[in-house]
Amino acid sequence: MDKKKGILLVALGTPRSCEADDVRDYLKEFLGDPLVIQKPRWLWLPILNGIILKVRPQKSAEMYKKIWTDEGSPLMIYTVAQAKQLQDMREDFDVRFAMTYGEPRIDKVIAEMKESGVEEITVLPLYPQYSLTTVEPVIQQVKKIDDKIKVIRDFHKVESYSDLLAESIREKWQANDYDKLVLSYHGIPLSYVTKKKDAYEEQCKETTRLVVSKLGLREEEYEHTYQSKFGPEKWLEPATIDRVAELPKENAKKVLICSPAFVADCLETLFELEIENKEVFVENGGETFDFVHPFNDSLDFTRVLSEVVDQNRL
């Protein structure tokens, strides 16, 4: 008799609400992870607890309020939809979802899957590119529970992923006369690449190479940037927010921006890119700033997830 199989989709996480107390709880867990902030605990924890968690939750809560919906967090809404659609598509699997930080917790969901009779679990972190700061925390949490569970490290080279990403950009790119396409990835500290040998930067660059090749873009037609810098440390560059300020002065006044590292809308896409970066672009003389949303609840993306699982189970 075949073993009962399961798929666990894992997203980063989201506060329970957009109120400051819930944002504080979320940030404490997220920023307290030594894989996310790789500083000595004796140095970092007093800064986190004594300064950041007293100031940042209220500021972040105001940002969350600008993107929160009647149904809740966009990231939660779309992650739930992705899991449901994948379950509908793959009746041969028990499909669940969890969050690295916040609820539902990875350990709790895996326990529920095992209690229901699932014997073979494949964990798919919802990040096309691997990073020590995103996928590795999932790997470590799963390893503590059951080191026999397979965790998929990345899927940026899966053809259907880059095809779908290119197609989502092509629809807008061809319909408008843009001066520049900006591919904005979530940034990480430079030291994680140079000292910790994080593969993230190279995988982001490979994603861009694949996409612009499919789109047939010349080098001068696109930019590869990094967003969401946090703290004083040097991060991967160029910074998205710096480039969107400079582009209008370089005669690129009509820009299309997308975020290939995100597969669902969240604070970084809906607030940081669509609101904050757009304001900076317009303030510096920009005219058109359009955004290609992540895949969200696209059925085509659900098919990509299904293919990723199959390719990694062979």
From Swiss-Prot:
Entry keyword Transmembrane helix: no
HAMAP family reported in the protein's UniProt record: Ferrochelatase
EC number(s) from the headed UniProt entry: 4.99.1.9
Recorded GO MF terms: ferrochelatase activity; metal ion binding
InterPro entries found in the cross-reference section: Ferrochelatase (IPR001015), Ferrochelatase_C (IPR033644), Ferrochelatase_N (IPR033659)
One GO cellular component, as annotated: cytoplasm
PANTHER family reported for this sequence: FERROCHELATASE (PTHR11108), FERROCHELATASE, MITOCHONDRIAL (PTHR11108:SF1)
Subcellular compartments: Cytoplasm
Organism of this sequence: Lactococcus lactis subsp. lactis (strain IL1403) (Streptococcus lactis)
NCBIfam families: hemH
Binding-site residues for Fe(2+), renumbered to this chain: 186, 268
GO terms under biological process: heme biosynthetic process
Pathway: Porphyrin-containing compound metabolism; protoheme biosynthesis
Coiled coil (residue ranges): none
Gene3D superfamilies: 3.40.50.1400
Pfam family membership, one: Ferrochelatase
Reaction catalysis annotation: Fe-coproporphyrin III + 2 H(+) = coproporphyrin III + Fe(2+)
Family according to the record: Belongs to the ferrochelatase family.
Alphabetically ordered keywords of this record: Cytoplasm, Heme biosynthesis, Iron, Lyase, Metal-binding, Porphyrin biosynthesis
The protein's name: Coproporphyrin III ferrochelatase
